[in-house]
């Protein structure tokens, strides 16, 4: 197998105009592969550390030249000569070199950039697609695209509390048709918003970001768009939410729609919402430290709704293990930069799947043209991917990669569809 001959890192811009890390790995057989690291807006307190320079007169303190230097001055010498196929060994070398629990010494953005680029290089050297290299001969499941078509919270300058209102086209026979139906609903929503004199400006992830009287009003608008596009709500198209409740949690209470609420009151709100709309999944419905609230909500509606931990778990196997033990949530959102290495990401997915938890592969609000998560979604067979609206090239790049993968798989491809949400029963 080819060995690592050189590693180059650079500072590039993400989709929000903020710096991020890009890494190129060169092998002794002439292979060169590149990976770029995403960045979040609403970040969990327990995420691995994203190293920023902090120089206020340069990129408002968000530069990543220190992370780049850590790669070129510290990581490179440790990895030269290793076989690129030794992913776990290479990642462990970087973790040992960092020496902290949260990757604060080298930076998760430095470690992850190298980790992903090494995997891509190894796949290329083996003349395999990344999804096949990571997932093996049985990787064949195309995920349901969880399309964030209306943005609120930290992803938009609007008065809507819930961060993401997603549509999931579970009734389509293929990923290609699922993407088409999602795009058609997205365009129909723009038409609905215009007709009602509501703003059609876009949030970070390509979804519309109007001011609305209530959060439920967003679901009403999307329901109208689904009908306008000619699809059946609850059968062809269902809803999913990312509440990002930590963003409006303070001093033990949730300030939601201008009113302070307890965890029990928030849980009651979600239950009523799920009774009124075809909601299959709710992400971060409660704060990242509200373990008792998570347990209560999961016990209450977890038999019919996917309860997803993002800030709760931060793709960290230790926190996921606690969630499994305490029956807090029943699904894990998977973000490679939350944990900071490919090996740990795959370990997190494996742990969740062995416990019967579902997984949803996810982008970040600050993205690049890198499409690694599309391949990861297929490689891990998670059946769900969250990568924004069908707009903005940083989001669409992942969907387009999945189209290519489906084409490559040909007759072996299977679309997850409604099987991705076994708890949901359509009306």
From Swiss-Prot:
SMART domains: Enolase_C, Enolase_N. Its main location: cytoplasm. Keywords: Cytoplasm, Glycolysis, Lyase, Magnesium, Metal-binding, Secreted. Disulfide bonds: none annotated. It catalyses: (2R)-2-phosphoglycerate = phosphoenolpyruvate + H2O. One of its GO terms (molecular function) is phosphopyruvate hydratase activity. This is Enolase. The gene is eno.
């Amino acid at each position: 197998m080819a060995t690592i001959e050189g590693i180059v890192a650079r500072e590039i811009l993400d989709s929000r105009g903020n710096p991020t890390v890009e890494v190129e790995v060169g092998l002794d057989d002439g292979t060169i592969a590149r990976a770029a690291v995403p960045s979040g807006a609403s970040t969990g307190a327990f995420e691995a550390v994203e190293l920023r320079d902090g120089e206020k007169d340069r990129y408002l303190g968000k530069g990543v030249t220190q992370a780049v230097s850590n790669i070129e001055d510290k990581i490179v010498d440790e990895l030269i000569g290793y076989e690129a196929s030794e992913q776990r060994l290479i990642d462990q070398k970087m973790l040992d070199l960092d020496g902290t629990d949260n990757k604060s010494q080298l930076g998760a953005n430095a470690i992850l950039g190298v980790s992903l680029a090494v995997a891509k290089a190894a796949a290329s050297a083996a003349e395999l697609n990344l999804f096949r290299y990571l997932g093996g001969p049985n990787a064949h499941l195309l995920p349901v695209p969880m399309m964030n078509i209306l943005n609120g919270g930290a992803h938009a300058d609007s008065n809507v509390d819930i961060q993401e209102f997603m549509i999931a086209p579970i009734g389509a026979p293929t990923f290609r048709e699922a993407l088409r139906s999602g795009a058609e609903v997205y365009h129909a929503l723009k038409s609905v918003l215009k007709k009602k004199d509501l703003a059609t400006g876009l949030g970070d992830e390509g979804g519309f970001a109007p001011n609305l009287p209530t959060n439920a009003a967003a679901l009403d608008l999307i329901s109208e768009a689904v009908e306008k596009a000619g699809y059946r709500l609850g059968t062809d198209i269902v809803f999913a939410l990312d509440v990002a409740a930590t963003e409006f949690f303070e001093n033990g209470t949730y300030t939601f729609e201008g009113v302070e609420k307890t965890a029990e009151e928030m849980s009651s709100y979600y239950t009523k919402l799920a009774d009124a709309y075809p909601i299959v999944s709710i992400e971060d419905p409660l704060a990242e430290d509200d373990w008792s609230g998570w347990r209560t909500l999961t016990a209450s509606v977890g038999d019919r709704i996917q309860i997803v931990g993002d800030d709760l778990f931060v793709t960290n196997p230790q926190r996921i293990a606690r969630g499994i033990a305490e029956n807090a949530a029943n699904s894990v959102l998977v973000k490679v930069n939350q944990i900071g290495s490919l090996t740990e990401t795959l370990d997190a997915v494996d742990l969740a799947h062995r416990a019967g938890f579902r997984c949803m592969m996810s982008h970040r609000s600050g993205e690049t043209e890198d499409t690694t998560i599309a391949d990861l979604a297929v490689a891990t067979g998670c059946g769900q991917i969250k990568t924004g609206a069908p707009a903005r090239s940083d989001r669409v790049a992942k969907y387009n990669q999945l189209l290519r993968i489906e084409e490559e798989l040909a007759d072996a491809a299977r679309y997850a569809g409604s099987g991705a949400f076994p708890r949901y029963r359509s009306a």
